[in-house]
Amino acid sequence: MLPNAMASNHVMPSGAPPVLPKADYRNAMARLGAAVNIITTDGPAGRAGFTASAVCSVTDEPPMLLVCLNRSASVYPAFTANGVLCVNVLAAGHQALSGLFGGKTPMDERFAAGRWSRKATGSPVLEDAAASFDCRVVQATSAGTHDVLFCEALAIAIGGAAQSLIYFDRRYHEIAAPPH
């Protein structure tokens, strides 16, 4: 059984927890391969999007996932005000698009580089994504510098791509599903 680290009476055996060097933590996290996603929103606060690898399935009943969003990101106000988003899982060949959404490129230029449609929430859905999850944000929790957005999927699209894009060791890699 795991210890209940959240309990108020829990104390680490050595007293205060050690402070990890930020560079060591970031270097170790670079070894945690992850899918590359473009997260989009549209609504009263405008259209916005960013590249993220901090996305995770939460539950399938109801269908829910989480997205981590830095509170200092320029897109933060649009996402929090709109309350809806689409997680677009990038297929192989989307490295350039990921770079546009991961940098300081103006929003109009980001969206001009892809083909987009809409589903239930009105958030932009990347037409050639490996998969897309169109969601409403049902809960947000602050953790350090980020908000963790819990998102209920209202619609999905599954693309025909047999290859996906992952980020590992600070580089993009393409992976393919084995033949059936």
From Swiss-Prot:
Alphabetized SUPFAM superfamilies for the sequence: FMN-binding split barrel
Keywords for this protein: Flavoprotein, FMN, NAD, Oxidoreductase
Cited InterPro entries: Flavin_Rdtase-like_dom, NADH-dep_flavin_reductase, RutF, Split_barrel_FMN-bd
Domain of life the protein comes from: Bacteria
Database matches in Pfam families: Flavin_Reduct
GO BP term (any one): uracil catabolic process
Gene Ontology terms for molecular function: FMN binding; FMN reductase (NADH) activity; FMN reductase [NAD(P)H] activity; riboflavin reductase (NADPH) activity
Entry keyword Cell division: no
Gene3D superfamilies assigned: Electron Transport, Fmn-binding Protein, Chain A
EC number(s) reported in the record: 1.5.1.42
Reaction(s) this enzyme catalyzes, per UniProt: FMNH2 + NAD(+) = FMN + NADH + 2 H(+)
Function of the protein: Catalyzes the reduction of FMN to FMNH2 which is used to reduce pyrimidine by RutA via the Rut pathway.
Stated family: Belongs to the non-flavoprotein flavin reductase family. RutF subfamily.
This protein's name: FMN reductase (NADH) RutF
Organism: Variovorax paradoxus (strain S110)
Organism lineage string: Bacteria, Pseudomonadati, Pseudomonadota, Betaproteobacteria, Burkholderiales
